[in-house]
């Protein structure tokens, strides 16, 4: 049985596999694999988390399992997921582990691994850990147990790293920035980075209590940030998600600037244009057309930063992302980093001496309607000839003006029907008609 999904192991705390007992076994299994594959006798693992209450319990269980397997653990405390990836590399650790469920509610949690290079763990190592989990936890030699130590200045190290990605001769002294920390992992380091670069920072949702992470705040709920930017007459707003690997921006008028806008800015407005951009099947068609006009190659990957990263590496490109705000800049970081992505946009604002809204003037997203069809039992819509015929008719109707995407959820019995085009009413009507057809044929 494989416990790993596309983004590690995730679920509701207290239910398998997100339990203290499983975390202990997982730590031991991962430790045994690292002992076999590490070039040193005492492998080192960097362990961090977000601000969920359950993170403390899972942290204790994981470190106990790792120590029992003979692994040394550096405890980082609450830090963004990309910070754990960076510190894994900086400390020359054998692996990094993040305890987080990203943008999910507080009662969920998850565990994911980074390789020593700060990248997602290879599938081959995940398979080895899965196999090791089938064995009983058995300590053979107490003389070879590992230890855990707390890294005293983990926050400071990561703050300095983020600042190093911003041009040394630039500063943010003339900007007022509202930062929504989602009561998550960036509650401390996020505002600090922008303050230390000279900005006047107004921090929101930076008081985590273990249960308020992502609660009506952060990149998935930016409404209050939009109001705050206008209220404080700020230059822009920055919203992170719970583990700060996603970012959504807000211009001074309170308008949202999502991942597609950010990729547009980095591809067309920066002094140095990227060799190409990787989006996903969810990236707006307007981005594809705008990049073609700017003569910047664009390809689509499957949904998920793992697939964006894979496509970037295959094409030897550095910039890619998703509309949700997962932005990768591989010349700066090995994984999606909300703070660094925001800094790259701020770099363009400073070098062009333009406000955020000016960088996206003339770039308008096509209307996009997503309808989630919840089913009693999952089915493949492309296995039903009548549905396939309807999909083909819709694609012919939208040809050159829009597109259709029908996909199954990877985590629940849901079919996602997405229609995009240049006419809002047409897109809305088509999405709901196709969704109803899927619902009818699934009954």
From Swiss-Prot:
Statement: the UniProt record of this protein carries the keyword Secreted: no
Enzyme Commission code(s) on record: 5.4.2.10
PTM note: Activated by phosphorylation.
Residue ranges crossing the lipid bilayer per the database entry: none
PTM annotation (Phosphoserine): residues: 102
Residues given in the record as Mg(2+) binding sites: 102, 241, 243, 245
One GO molecular-function entry: phosphomannomutase activity
Descriptive protein name: Phosphoglucosamine mutase
InterPro entries membership: A-D-PHexomutase_a/b/a-I, A-D-PHexomutase_a/b/a-I/II/III, A-D-PHexomutase_a/b/a-II, A-D-PHexomutase_a/b/a-III, A-D-PHexomutase_C, A-D-PHexomutase_C_sf, A-D-PHexomutase_CS, Alpha-D-phosphohexomutase_SF
Alphabetized Gene3D superfamilies for the sequence: Alpha-D-Glucose-1,6-Bisphosphate, subunit A, domain 3, Alpha-D-phosphohexomutase, C-terminal domain
Species of origin: Acinetobacter baylyi (strain ATCC 33305 / BD413 / ADP1)
Keywords, in A-Z order: Isomerase, Magnesium, Metal-binding, Phosphoprotein
PROSITE patterns found in the cross-reference section: PGM_PMM (PS00710)
GO biological process: carbohydrate metabolic process; peptidoglycan biosynthetic process; UDP-N-acetylglucosamine biosynthetic process
Top-level taxon of the source organism: Bacteria
Active site per the UniProt annotation: 102 (phosphoserine intermediate)
Cofactors that this protein relies on: Mg(2+)
Function recorded in the entry: Catalyzes the conversion of glucosamine-6-phosphate to glucosamine-1-phosphate.
A matching Pfam family: PGM_PMM_III
CC annotations in GO: cytosol
NCBIfam families in alphabetical order: glmM, PRK10887.1
């Amino acid at each position: 049985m494989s416990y790993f999904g596309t983004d590690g192991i995730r679920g509701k705390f207290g239910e398998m596999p997100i339990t203290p007992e499983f975390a202990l076994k997982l730590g031991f299994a991962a430790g045994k694999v690292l002992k076999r594959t590490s070039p040193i006798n005492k492998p080192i693992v960097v362990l961090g988390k977000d601000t969920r209450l359950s993170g403390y319990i899972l942290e204790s269980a994981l470190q106990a399992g790792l120590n029992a397997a003979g692994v040394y653990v550096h405890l980082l405390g609450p830090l963004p997921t990309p910070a754990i990836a960076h510190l894994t590399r900086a400390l020359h650790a054998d692996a990094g582990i993040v305890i987080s469920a990203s943008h999910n509610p507080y009662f969920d949690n998850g565990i994911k691994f980074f390789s020593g290079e700060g990248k997602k763990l290879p599938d081959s190592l995940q398979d080895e850990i899965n196999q090791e989990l089938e064995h009983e936890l058995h300590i053979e030699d107490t003389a070879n147990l590992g230890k855990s130590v707390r890294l005293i200045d983990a926050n400071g190290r990561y703050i300095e790293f983020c600042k190093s990605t911003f041009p040394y001769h630039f500063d943010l002294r003339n900007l007022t920035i509202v930062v929504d920390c989602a009561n998550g992992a960036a509650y401390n380091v996020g505002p600090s980075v922008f303050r230390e670069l000279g900005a006047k920072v107004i921090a929101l949702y930076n008081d985590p209590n273990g249960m308020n992470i992502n609660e009506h705040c952060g990149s998935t709920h930016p409404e209050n940030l939009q109001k705050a930017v206008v209220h404080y007459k700020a230059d822009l707003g920055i919203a992170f998600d719970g583990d700060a690997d996603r970012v959504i921006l807000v211009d001074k008028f309170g308008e949202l600037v999502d991942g597609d806008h950010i990729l547009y800015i980095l591809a067309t407005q920066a002094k140095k244009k990227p060799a190409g951009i990787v989006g996903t099947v969810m990236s707006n068609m307007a981005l594809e057309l705008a990049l073609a006009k700017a003569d910047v190659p664009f390809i689509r990957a499957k949904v998920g930063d793992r697939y964006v990263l894979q496509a970037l590496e295959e094409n030897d490109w550095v910039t890619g992302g998703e509309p949700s705000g997962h932005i990768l800049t591989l010349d700066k970081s090995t994984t999606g980093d909300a703070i660094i992505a925001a800094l790259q946009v701020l770099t363009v604002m400073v070098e062009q001496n333009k406000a955020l809204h000016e960088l996206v003037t003339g770039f308008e997203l096509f209307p996009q309607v997503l309808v989630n069809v919840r089913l009693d039992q999952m089915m493949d819509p492309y296995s039903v000839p009548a549905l396939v015929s309807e999909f083909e008719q819709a694609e012919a109707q939208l040809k050159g003006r829009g597109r259709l995407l029908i996909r199954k959820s990877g985590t629940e019995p849901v079919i996602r029907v997405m229609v995009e085009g240049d006419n809002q009413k047409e897109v809305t009507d088509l999405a709901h008609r196709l969704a109803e057809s899927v619902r009818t044929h699934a009954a």
